[in-house]
């Protein structure tokens, strides 16, 4: 497949590999796809069919497919995507939507038979023992910013960094606060790496504002990040799961 795809790339012909090796699925009855990021358009309006087609291959082997904790759509800006996903989603054995926007959108596509609504699974993750908000002087605001979401709003990382750096300056000036940068996703893909993105914002700031900011520059994991979140009075989050992390520790 890789050879075929490479050859076609020289001809500028896109080729989607629909599935990988399937030996590992022998003996399984059900496969869960957790989260809904693959069921949205990219910031440039494109879509990737690789994983959905792979999951359809599993269904052809008699394995049920459940999409759990999903946010889906919208696809109207890309008619090919709308047609593909409308057909694909109708095949899924169960779609568990995590919020009402997805619920209403899928109903508008007449996808009612295999649809239900339930809280995001992140709400059920157990907190570390005795994890309670810390008492301190002054205001600490935790901020999570995502290059992925910024691309949807601004179109380029450079523009987003400049605009959001200015927003951080205004926040510190008006609230007289300290800021804790909370990266949620650390990815090899720079366009999806919160830490690299927030470091770029930090580097844009004047020194006197940098002195009021601390960056979590490690990867403590989903649960480990809660220990930093409880230091905050408020959290502003681009990533849904970072926001849920804050809610579940009463911030």
Show which residues each predicted segment covers.
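Active-site anion-handling motifs in enzyme catalytic cores
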Residues: 1-251
């Amino acid at each position: 497949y890789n050879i075929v795809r490479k050859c076609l790339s020289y001809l500028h012909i896109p080729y989607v590999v629909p599935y990988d090796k399937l030996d590992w699925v022998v003996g399984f009855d059900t496969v869960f796809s957790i989260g809904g990021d693959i069921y949205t358009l990219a910031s440039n309006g494109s879509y990737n069919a690789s994983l959905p087609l792979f999951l359809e291959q599993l269904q052809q082997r008699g394995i049920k497919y459940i999409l759990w904790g999903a946010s889906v759509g919208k696809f109207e800006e890309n008619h090919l995507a709308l047609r593909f996903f409308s057909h694909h989603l109708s095949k899924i054995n169960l779609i568990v939507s995590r919020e009402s926007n997805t619920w209403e959108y899928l109903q508008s596509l007449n996808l009612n038979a295999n649809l239900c609504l339930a809280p995001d699974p992140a709400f059920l993750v157990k907190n570390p023992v005795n994890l309670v908000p810390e008492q301190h002087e002054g205001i600490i605001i935790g901020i999570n910013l995502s290059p992925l979401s910024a691309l949807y709003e601004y179109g380029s990382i450079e523009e987003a960094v400049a605009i959001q750096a200015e927003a951080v300056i205004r926040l510190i000036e008006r609230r007289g606060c300290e800021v804790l940068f909370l990266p949620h996703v650390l990815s090899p893909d720079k366009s999806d790496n919160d830490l690299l993105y927030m470091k770029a914002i930090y580097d844009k700031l004047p020194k006197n504002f940098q002195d009021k900011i601390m960056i979590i520059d490690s990867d403590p994991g989903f649960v480990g990040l809660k220990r930093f979140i409880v230091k905050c009075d408020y959290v502003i989050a681009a990533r849904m799961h970072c926001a849920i992390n804050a809610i579940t520790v009463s911030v």
